[in-house]
From Swiss-Prot:
Residues engaged in binding S-adenosyl-L-methionine: G71, F76, A122, E123, R135
Task performed by this protein: Specifically methylates the N7 position of a guanine in 16S rRNA.
Keywords: Cytoplasm, Methyltransferase, rRNA processing, S-adenosyl-L-methionine, Transferase
A single GO cellular-component term on record: cytosol
Gene: rsmG
Protein name as annotated: Ribosomal RNA small subunit methyltransferase G
GO molecular function terms attached to this record: rRNA (guanine-N7-)-methyltransferase activity
Record has Membrane as a keyword: no
Location of this chain's protein in the cell: Cytoplasm
Pfam family, one: GidB
EC number: 2.1.1.-
Domain of life: Bacteria
Family: Belongs to the methyltransferase superfamily. RNA methyltransferase RsmG family.
SUPFAM superfamilies: S-adenosyl-L-methionine-dependent methyltransferases
Length: 207
């Protein structure tokens, strides 16, 4: 938890409480349904929570922003972002029902009010969003195909509506394959831990 407060110094008491609740909630649910690798559970705050919040260092969502988290797994990046941005609306979707069960239990246990969940596929979602977030669920080109028609044309954030994608390594080939403008932000510009040396946020504008 200290690592979150190290990089996000203006958390409200409620946010501190919610972030603080995540370790025990994930530890409990991970024993029933494995959503975080066993070796990572002790590094939950660095490798999952803070990693998710890397998106917040690139884009601070304004109140009323609608965000879709595709392939959320156990709730990353959606749950940490929903705590940090309580006035934005988050829709977390995954095709595996037991993972959505964990998301629902963790968000309820932490008292998070601005999340809704769907057990299903991104292609079947009919709503419109300002941003789609995800954490390395597939290559950019197929991912774009899943979400290209999900974007609202209502623009009011500092970045253009689009994808904010957490990925690592050399992405040149994937971005070339995507054949759309894409902007890379190295997370080691914001976080000093070695884990983030090769981690990035990629912004793919929708329009």
């Amino acid at each position: 938890m200290q690592i979150i407060e190290k990089y996000f110094k203006h958390l409200s008491p409620e946010q501190v409480k919610q972030f603080g609740a995540l370790h025990s909630l994930y530890t409990e649910w991970n024993e029933k349904i494995n959503v975080v690798s066993r070796k990572d559970i002790d590094q939950l705050y660095e490798r999952h929570v803070l990693h998710s919040l890397g998106i917040a260092k690139v884009m601070a969502f304004k109140p009323g922003t609608r965000i879709l988290d595709v392939g959320t797994g156990g709730g990353f990046p959606g749950i940490p972002l929903s705590i940090l941005f309580p006035e934005s609306d988050f829709h977390l979707i995954d095709s595996i029902g037991k993972k959505i069960k964990v998301v629902e239990e963790v968000s309820a246990g932490a008292g998070i009010k601005n999340i809704r969940t769907t057990h299903g596929r991104a292609e079947d979602v009919t709503d419109r969003y300002h941003f789609v977030v995800s954490r390395a669920v597939t290559r950019f080109k197929p991912f774009w195909g899943w979400v290209a028609k999900k974007f609202s044309d209502e623009q009011f954030n500092d970045l253009n509506n689009g994808i904010l994608y957490l990925k690592g390594g050399d992405l040149d080939e994937e971005i070339q394959e995507l054949n759309r403008p894409a902007y890379e932000y190295d997370l080691n510009m914001f976080f000093e831990e070695e884990f983030f040396d090769t981690k990035k946020v990629v912004h793919v504008p929708a329009f």
